[in-house]
Amino acid sequence: MAFQQSSPLVKFEASPAESFLSAPGDNFTSLFADSTPSTLNPRDMMTPDSVADIDSRLSVIPESQDAEDDESHSTSATAPSTSEKKPVKKRKSWGQVLPEPKTNLPPRKRAKTEDEKEQRRVERVLRNRRAAQSSRERKRLEVEALEKRNKELETLLINVQKTNLILVEELNRFRRSSGVVTRSSSPLDSLQDSITLSQQLFGSRDGQTMSNPEQSLMDQIMRSAANPTVNPASLSPSLPPISDKEFQTKEEDEEQADEDEEMEQTWHETKEAAAAKEKNSKQSRVSTDSTQRPAVSIGGDAAVPVFSDDAGANCLGLDPVHQDDGPFSIGHSFGLSAALDADRYLLESQLLASPNASTVDDDYLAGDSAACFTNPLPSDYDFDINDFLTDDANHAAYDIVAASNYAAADRELDLEIHDPENQIPSRHSIQQPQSGASSHGCDDGGIAVGV
C-alpha cells in the first residue's frame, strides 16, 4: 500500500478501457453514470436504422426468454456448485448491464487480482459488442444490396414477360389473318418453337399433281389442331438419287453435242468459202482482160503498141475484160498470166510467124497491120478474126494457152516476178516464150516490161 501512496500522480482518462496509463489502487470515476437504468434495451445501443430498414428484418429477443435462460443457467450452475463446491463461470445474458470495474489496469499489464480480472472482462465484453455491431452493420449493407439487385431482376423479368405476351398475341393475330389454322393457345406456347407452313408452299412441282396419300396427309396436317409443326422434307416429292455414272454420261453427251455443233458450223463455213471461191474462178474463166495497158519492147527498136483503152483490144479481135479478172489480163505486170496472154496476143495478131522470138530484124508478119497500129481505132482496123479461127495451128495454140490460163486460175497460183535473163523454157514446143524473153538468153537490145 505504501508503494501505491508514494507513486506520482498521473492524469488519466475518463474511462479505464481507453486509457493507456493507470496505477493500481487509484480510484476512477464509474464507467456508467448513476442515471443509467438497471435494464438496458439492446436496440438503444445500436446505430440508427436506415431508411430502407424494416422492423421485421431484425428479430428482437424477448426479455422473458433471456430471464428464463438465466434461470436455467443458474440452476444448472448451482447444482454442481453445491455438490462439488467449485466456482463455475457464469455467462451473462446479452444486453446485460455491466458492473463498474474497481481497478484501472493498463492494457498491456496482466491481470492478477479479481478486480483486475473483472476489469478485463468488462473491457472484453465492450470490445465484442463493438465488433458485433460493426458485423451486423456490414451484413445489413450486404443484405440491402442483394435485395436491391433482386428487385431489379424481378422488374426485368416482369417486363420480359409482358413483352413475350405481346409478341404471342401479335403472332396469333397474324396467324388468324393469314388463314393458318392453329390450336388454342396455352401457357407453354412461348416455350415451343412452332413452325407453320402456308398452303402455297405445297403446290405441284413441274406440273405434276401429288398422289392421293400425299394429298390426304396435306389435308390432315392443315386441318389438324393439335400439331401445327410440319416437316417440309416429308411433304416434298421424293426424287431418286442420281448415280455418278448417269451424271458423267449426261456431261459427256453435252460435251459431244457442243463438239458436233462446232464441227457443223466449221463445215458450213468451209463449204461457203469453197462455193465463193469456185464462183470467182468461173467468172475469171469466162472474161478476158483488156483494161490493162502494157508496153512491151522486143529487142532493138521494134516495139509493140500500147493500148490506151478497149479500142486496141477490139482492134486485135480480143474481148474486153472485167475488173475482177485483172490478175489474168495481158497488162498485169510481172505475172505468169500476163506473159501467157502476151504470147497469145502475138499468135493471134500474126506478128511473128517464126517461133524464134529473138529474130526481130526479119519481118514475119502474115499480113499488113500497120494501119491498125498507127491508128488503133476500131474503124481503121481491118483484121479479120475468122482468118485466125480457120488456122488449125494457131487454133491449137490458142487452146493450149487458154487451158494453161484456166489451170492457173483453178489452182490459184501466186503471182511471181520473172527474171527476163533466166527464163524457164515452155513445156509445149508450139507455145511461144514469154514477152520480153528469149529462148537462148538475153538480147543485145533493152528488154523491159512496164505498165
Curated annotation (Swiss-Prot):
Sorted UniProt keywords: Activator, DNA-binding, Nucleus, Transcription, Transcription regulation, Unfolded protein response
Family: Belongs to the bZIP family.
Organism: Hypocrea jecorina (Trichoderma reesei)
Known function: Transcriptional activator involved in the unfolded protein response (UPR) pathway. Recognizes and binds to the UPR element (UPRE) in the promoter of UPR-regulated genes. Increases the synthesis of endoplasmic reticulum-resident proteins required for protein folding as well as components of the secretory pathway.
Listed CDD domains: bZIP_HAC1-like
Record region (Disordered): 1-137, 228-296
GO CC, alphabetical: nucleus
Protein name in the entry: Transcriptional activator hac1
A biological-process GO annotation: positive regulation of transcription by RNA polymerase II
Molecular-function GO term, any one: DNA binding
Gene: hac1
